[in-house]
């Protein structure tokens, strides 16, 4: 019977007296109120394991002297039985405590919604009461208010739920748990019970422990047990081929017969060691389990590695050092240490420990090794046997670096070639005719291999420095001398040419400052000034930039980001250019464009798929090409997820770089919401929302056209706006357009807004799991595809500011200030927590149906002061109170107090579940017709930038009262930092 996954937490604890683990507070039960802080502490002789129902907000405190579980905001979902078990000593047993979170609004906590058992087993319906006082009024019903079958025998356990004895196939049904609270009936949601017919089979066996080590004289216990639905089976325990005469204990548990033979040894000796077998058999068959029992003279600790202790890697490579430890008793202390010789610029060592029975695996991660990280790495471990250690020596391989100089020695010309690298490079000299920068052995007049160069320096873990000398007597003019070096990492060369000095002719003295010379100097000065001015203007011109950042490591508040240009590009993404058939331009901007295309053979040979292709303009500069390539590399690095615009392929050879992504038929979320808002007659408030807030808010007036932007890829200004729609090239396209038009007429519901919010949160949680910081989370950067699936896109930020008066140049980077967290605005600090702040602004956009954030407030000193002082926007008219609470938590000035994206996903899914269940929620009403089509095409780069704050009074309905008087001038959502 499966009741859902358990909560399992491990922690090494301090030693205390012999016996079972102890849970504090003591007592079999603990009753608390919702919102209280609950702390459960388990003290044991060694490592312990907690198990119990999965519930939110439990944390494990590694600093406590024992294994401590804490929740600072208890909810009814924390109700359940929690067990603490000592891992290393099965004789010690375990200790339990049952927690009640007494919530009058939630009488039941369901641990599972489906239970499957075999006929004849005990079936547990895990509906737990949250208040022990309710146990006398509980009852069980079948779905639809029907009574439980008269032949069904069941009882209620406050710790486990309703238990049906010897379940029958006829008992398969949906059950509802009921109780009375203050004279009113309180019911749980349904639990589906499925009872399968029993099939005869051999007994199930268990031999514990699976491996055992004891020091001579210690106590030990080996338990052989078997279970079966029928009583007719036998169990024996053997050591080698010898059957052990051990008493048999029988029991009947959970509708199964259980038979146990337990061997207890008070003081083990060497003759007790060996292979033990547990054998159970019946008329159907036999099952056997074996284990190895080892008796040792004393404690031991052995460290080994399958790797060589002398490691060599190239600079920039990554390496994992792995050590296996076999130990009894448990290892108490261990640590990795760097022993030098380079102690400057050392970063904190990153390692993990994997634990099995009497065996440990220690792994040290050395990522992108730097020159200063070569040297000795030392693992030290301790148990009762004492200390043991293992040392790795890491040497870095360097490609050769070469320098050629000339010096006369005793009247003869000598060329010196100084070379550094590791392993020691080989040196070859070549003499070639003429002044050339290339020469091989076939072209060379003479070749000398220096097999014994002079070693100038050979320090451990560092480069070898050598010098090769080529005595040539007299340098020959019109000759080039090459010093070529090579080792296993790479090769390098440098040439030297003799310079011929002819006789100089003295010119007659003339005045330097003649009028002609002065004029020439003046013209040259003007040209230089003009060149500097053009260079300055070019530097000021915004570049196509990559906004996302991927964290390589962090220490405290100090983050180190991966350089995306250094990421590898996997050729598996390469797609033939000839298999792309381009359609209409979806959007064009200052640096490139997004084009609809049909891809033939993408994924499968006969596949035909509509895609979006991002490309640069032919006038793009090298740094912009590098930025697009970086964007391609990072998309391939992140991998696939349903809620991000996924990479499908790329064309990087034989022409300009093309990035092929998913085609999003509904365009960006911002314009989608605004098109829906145009059809709105009034708000549809949820029952949990204040009814007094702006009840006169009836019609959202929006302009008929919005500037379509894609971070510079699809931004042309209002006049050159290209509506992103599917291109009708076939009858199937016309049907597709009809589906989109039909969808356009469907009114929005509150569930739709929750659906968009939850999907974006899931996409952001995926990016956070990949250590990716988006830095531009906004509705304009979320695209919608078939089925209203929201996808996060627009990882690059580049705007067409040349034709947009809303942007003021104050540097070389534009920033979405109204979406940014305070630490990003004032300290230029970007973290996952700053993305959470931006997500809160996006939530506000969604539940205001596409209004501008901070309506009526300009981006100026007043705006910055409001943000710094903790100003928060008012509750949007379509947002329930719970959603607005999420927004407020996202806007906490202290980043560490903001929720994680995983927590946001959980809260939104809970709200969506309640919305689906509550039939009183009404749809957001529509005008009966669609004034805007939802069939706008989208792309990976597709986004839209809203027009700045309109002066309509409807927009001010979402403002704080003090902000309504703020004049609505033309604002600027982006500024330079």
Swiss-Prot record:
Q: In which tissues is it expressed?
A: Widely expressed.
Which CDD domains does this one have? Answer: PTKc_CSF-1R
The enzyme class is transferase
Q: Name one GO biological process term.
A: cell-cell junction maintenance
Q: Identify the stretch(es) annotated as Regulatory juxtamembrane domain.
A: 540-572
The record, for InterPro entries, names: CSF-1_receptor, Ig-like_dom, Ig-like_dom_sf, Ig-like_fold, Ig_sub, Ig_sub2, Immunoglobulin_dom, Kinase-like_dom_sf
| EC number(s) given by UniProt | 2.7.10.1
Using the record's annotation, list all stretches that form the Protein kinase domain. Answer: 580-913
Positions of the region Activation loop?
A: 794-816
UniProt feature, compositional bias: Gly residues: 929-941
Detail the disulphide connectivity of this chain as listed in its UniProt entry.
42-84, 127-177, 224-278, 417-483
GO CC field: cell surface; CSF1-CSF1R complex; membrane; nucleoplasm; plasma membrane
Q: Can you quote the domain comment?
A: The juxtamembrane domain functions as autoinhibitory region. Phosphorylation of tyrosine residues in this region leads to a conformation change and activation of the kinase.
Q: How does it assemble?
A: Monomer. Homodimer. Interacts with CSF1 and IL34. Interaction with dimeric CSF1 or IL34 leads to receptor homodimerization. Interacts with INPPL1/SHIP2 and THOC5. Interacts (tyrosine phosphorylated) with PLCG2 (via SH2 domain). Interacts (tyrosine phosphorylated) with PIK3R1 (via SH2 domain). Interacts (tyrosine phosphorylated) with FYN, YES1 and SRC (via SH2 domain). Interacts (tyrosine phosphorylated) with CBL, GRB2 and SLA2.
Q: What is this protein called?
A: Macrophage colony-stimulating factor 1 receptor
In its UniProt entry, the species of origin is given as: Mus musculus
Taxonomic lineage of this organism? Eukaryota, Metazoa, Chordata, Craniata, Vertebrata
């Amino acid at each position: 019977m499966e009741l859902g996954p358990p909560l399992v937490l491990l922690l090494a604890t301090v030693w205390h007296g012999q016996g079972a683990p102890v849970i504090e507070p003591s007592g079999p039960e603990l009753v608390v109120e919702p919102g209280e802080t609950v702390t459960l502490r388990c003290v044991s002789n060694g490592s312990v394991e907690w198990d119990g129902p999965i519930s939110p907000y439990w944390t494990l405190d590694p600093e406590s002297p024992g294994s401590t579980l804490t929740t600072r905001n208890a909810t009814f979902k924390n109700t359940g039985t929690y067990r603490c078990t000592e891992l290393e000593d099965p004789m010690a047993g375990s200790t339990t405590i049952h927690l009640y979170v007494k919530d009058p609004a939630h009488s039941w906590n369901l641990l599972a919604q489906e239970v499957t058992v075999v006929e004849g087993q005990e079936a547990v319906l895990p509906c737990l009461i949250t208040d022990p006082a309710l146990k006398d009024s509980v009852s069980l019903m079948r779905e639809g208010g029907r009574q439980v079958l008269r032949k069904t025998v069941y009882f209620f356990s406050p710790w486990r739920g309703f238990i049906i004895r010897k379940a029958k196939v006829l008992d398969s049904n949906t059950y509802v748990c009921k109780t009375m609270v203050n004279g009113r009936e309180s019911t749980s949601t349904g639990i589906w019970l499925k009872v399968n017919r029993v099939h005869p089979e051999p007994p199930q066996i268990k031999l514990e422990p699976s491996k055992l080590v004891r020091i001579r004289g210690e106590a030990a216990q080996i338990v052989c047990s078997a279970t079966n639905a029928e009583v007719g089976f036998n169990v024996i325990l053997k050591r080698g081929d010898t059957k052990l005469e051990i008493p048999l204990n029988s029991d009947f548990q959970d509708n199964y017969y259980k038979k146990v033979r337990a061997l207890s040894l008070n003081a083990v000796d060497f003759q007790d060691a060996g292979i033990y077998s547990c054998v159970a058999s019946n008329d159907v068959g036999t099952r056997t389990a074996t284990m190895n029992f080892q008796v040792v003279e004393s404690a031991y600790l052995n460290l080994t590695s399958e790797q060589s202790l002398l490691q060599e890697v190239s600079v920039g490579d990554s390496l994992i050092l792995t050590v296996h430890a076999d130990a009894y008793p448990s290892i108490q202390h261990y640590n990795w240490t760097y022993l030098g010789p380079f102690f400057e610029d050392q970063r904190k060592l990153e390692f993990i420990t994997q634990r099995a029975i009497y065996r440990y695996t220690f792994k040290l991660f050395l990522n992108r090794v730097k020159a200063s990280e070569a040297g000795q790495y030392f693992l030290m471990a301790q148990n009762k046997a004492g200390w043991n250690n293992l040392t790795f020596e890491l040497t870095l391989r360097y490609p050769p670096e070469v320098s050629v100089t000339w010096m006369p020695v005793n009247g003869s010309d000598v060329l010196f070639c100084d070379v550094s690298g590791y392993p020691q490079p080989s040196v070859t000299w070549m003499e070639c005719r003429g002044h050339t920068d290339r020469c091989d052995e076939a072209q060379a007049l003479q070749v000398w291999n220096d097999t014994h160069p002079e070693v100038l320096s050979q320090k451990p873990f560092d480069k070898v420095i050598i010098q090769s000398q080529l005595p040539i007597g007299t340098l020959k003019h019109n000759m080039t001398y090459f010093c070529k070096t090579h080792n296993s990492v790479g090769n390098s060369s440098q040439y030297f040419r003799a310079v011929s000095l002819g006789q100089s002719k003295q010119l007659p003295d003339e005045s330097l400052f003649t009028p002609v010379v002065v004029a020439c100097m003046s013209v040259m000065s003007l040209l230089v000034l003009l060149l500097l001015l053009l260079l300055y203007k070019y530097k000021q011109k915004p570049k196509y930039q990559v906004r996302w950042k991927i964290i390589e490591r962090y220490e405290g508040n100090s983050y180190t980001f991966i350089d995306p240009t250094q990421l590898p590009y996997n050729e598996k993404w390469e797609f033939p250019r000839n298999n792309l058939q381009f359609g209409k331009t979806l959007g064009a901007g200052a640096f490139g464009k997004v084009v609809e295309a049909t891809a033939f053979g993408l994924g499968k040979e006969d596949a035909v798929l509509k895609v979006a292709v991002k490309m640069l303009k032919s006038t793009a500069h090298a740094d912009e090409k590098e930025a697009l390539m970086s964007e391609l590399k990072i998309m391939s690095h992140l991998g696939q997820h349903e809620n991000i615009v996924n990479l499908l392929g790329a064309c990087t050879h034989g022409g300009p770089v093309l990035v092929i992504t998913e085609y999003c038929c509904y365009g960006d979320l911002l314009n989608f919401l605004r098109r829906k808002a145009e059809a709105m007659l009034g708000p549809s408030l949820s029952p949990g929302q204040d009814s007094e807030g702006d009840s006169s808010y009836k019609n959202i007036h929006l302009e008929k056209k919005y500037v379509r932007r894609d971070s510079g890829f699809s931004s042309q200004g209002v006049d050159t706006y290209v509506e992103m729609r599917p291109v009708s090239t076939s009858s199937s396209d016309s049907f597709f357009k009809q589906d989109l038009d039909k969808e356009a007429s469907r009114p929005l519901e509150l569930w739709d807004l929750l659906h968009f919010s939850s999907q974006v949160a899931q996409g952001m949680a995926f990016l956070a799991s990949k250590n990716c910081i988006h830095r531009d989370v906004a509705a304009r950067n979320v695209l919608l595809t078939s089925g209203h699936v929201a996808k996060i896109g627009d990882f690059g930020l580049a705007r067409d500011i040349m034709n947009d008066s809303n942007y003021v140049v104050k540097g070389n980077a534009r920033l979405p200030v109204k979406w940014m967290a305070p630490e990003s605005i004032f300290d230029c600090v970007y973290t996952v927590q700053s993305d959470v702040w931006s997500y809160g602004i996006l939530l506000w956009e969604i539940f205001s149906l596409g209004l501008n954030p901070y309506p009526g407030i300009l981006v100026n000193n007043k705006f910055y002061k409001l943000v710094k002082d903790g100003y928060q926007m008012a509750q949007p008219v379509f947002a329930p109170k719970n959603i607005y609470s999420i927004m407020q938590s996202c806007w906490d000035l202290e980043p560490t107090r903001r929720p994680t994206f995983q927590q946001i996903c959980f809260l939104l899914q809970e709200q969506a579940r309640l919305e689906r269940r509550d039939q009183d929620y009404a749809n957001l009403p529509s005008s009966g017709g669609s004034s805007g089509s939802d069939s706008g095409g989208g792309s990976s780069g597709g986004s839209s930038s809203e027009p700045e704050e309109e002066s309509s009074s409807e927009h001010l309905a979402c403002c704080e009262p003090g902000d309504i008087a703020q004049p609505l001038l033309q604002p600027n959502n982006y500024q330079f930092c």
